[in-house]
């Protein structure tokens, strides 16, 4: 993890990675999933300290009752080197420091890798989010 630094970011900085995330989700699951909207948005990026390249990001939506984090995304060259863990750790520290009352992390239920990552970090399934079937109104 020492070769990755995490910092808060502006929406404009995460926009390119958000596009990569959506494209990857569409390939993996046959449909894109939407990251949180920028209203009330909080963002973090993970930078490779050697190259300065942004190799991951996390987004969250802040509400009076708490914060929903998701997605936590890393580029291929940021995977299996602690980038996701560094992002999650920075978010957890921020949540504690700012006294956000409730934090939850959203992950696509079909994303086995994402679910396994969060379980290994001490998270468990909680609230279920329902999405319309393909072709249904609102899909």
Each predicted region: which residue ranges?
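Conserved acetyl-CoA pyrophosphate-binding loop and the N-cap/start of the following alpha-helix
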Residues: 78, 82-90
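Conserved active-site alpha-helix within GNAT-family acetyltransferase domains
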Residues: 85, 97, 109-127, 132, ...
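Actinobacteria-biased recognition of intrinsically disordered, low-complexity terminal regions
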Residues: 1-3, 138-139
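Acetyl-CoA-dependent GNAT
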Residues: 8-70, 75, 88, 131-135
């Amino acid at each position: 993890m020492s070769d990755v630094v995490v910092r808060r970011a502006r929406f404009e900085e995460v926009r390119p990675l958000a596009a990569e995330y959506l494209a990857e989700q569409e390939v993996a699951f046959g449909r894109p999933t939407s990251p949180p909207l920028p209203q009330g948005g909080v963002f973090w990026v993970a930078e490779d300290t050697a190259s300065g390249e942004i190799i991951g990001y996390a987004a969250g939506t802040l509400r009076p009752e708490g914060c929903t984090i998701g997605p936590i995304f890393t580029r291929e060259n940021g995977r299996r080197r602690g980038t996701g863990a560094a992002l999650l750790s920075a978010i957890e520290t921020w949540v504690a420091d700012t006294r956000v009352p409730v934090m939850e992390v959203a992950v696509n239920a079909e994303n086995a890798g994402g679910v396994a990552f969060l379980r290994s970090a001490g998270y468990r399934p909680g609230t279920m989010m329902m999405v319309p079937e393909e072709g249904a109104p609102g899909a």
